[in-house]
Design a protein with these regions (language model features):
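Small-residue-biased structural context
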Residues: 1-140
Length: 140
């Protein structure tokens, strides 16, 4: 289970809110996996996929509007992570493998989220909020 204290905060409240919503969904999926509730897991995984699509799309739109210099790199990481999530959802829908899903939801995804927020989202939020240029942090 992820704890709110584990989520790094960035310079934009809207991004922090989105990350918190994602953490809550991940925790609900973790609970459903522990309970071996296939139907609930399926519904929640679909919700996480939709939330992630909207989350990444919103960030990417802000980056394009503000002409964020490392946009292609950030978008590429979103595409990779979204592809991985789609694969996890497809595998779940085919096999209902609780053990594989538990590893992804309990380890892989939370670790990626924290790392992504600490690096790419922090630089992005700082730029979008006018705090600092990503180029001054070596991201260009």
């Amino acid at each position: 289970m992820m704890r709110q204290e584990e989520l790094p905060m960035v310079a934009m409240a809207s991004m922090n809110d989105t990350h918190l919503e994602e953490m809550i969904l991940i925790n609900k999926i973790s609970e459903a996996v522990v309970q071996k509730d296939e139907e609930k897991v399926t519904v929640l995984l679909d919700a996480l996929l939709q939330h992630t699509i909207e989350h990444f799309g919103g960030e990417e739109e802000m980056m394009r509007q503000k002409r964020f210099p490392p946009y292609p790199m950030h978008k590429g990481e979103h595409d990779r992570a979204l592809g991985e999530l789609r694969n996890v959802v497809a595998l779940w829908n085919e096999q209902h493998d609780f053990a594989s899903l538990a590893r992804y939801i309990g380890e892989t995804l939370p670790q990626w989220i924290v790392q992504h927020i600490r690096t790419m989202d922090t630089a992005t939020a700082n730029f979008l909020a006018g705090v600092v240029s990503p180029c001054s942090q070596g991201h260009c």
